[in-house]
Amino acid sequence: MQVVKIPNETIKFKYGTVDKHAVVFQDTIVYTGSEPQCNRFVHYMDGSSAEEILERAK
């Protein structure tokens, strides 16, 4: 899994605006959010099967 920045897209939170990121697994975006949210997703899904990870993309 790889966390990549989505160019020209941001997310607005109550404390400010941050860049939007995505988690890419086997050429599929499985999660989008802020960089810390994406890193947390990668951490929690570490060790999961490919089917479980790709199920999150639906």
Per-range role (PLM):
Residues 1-22, 46, 50-56:
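Short N-terminal "domain-start" leader segments
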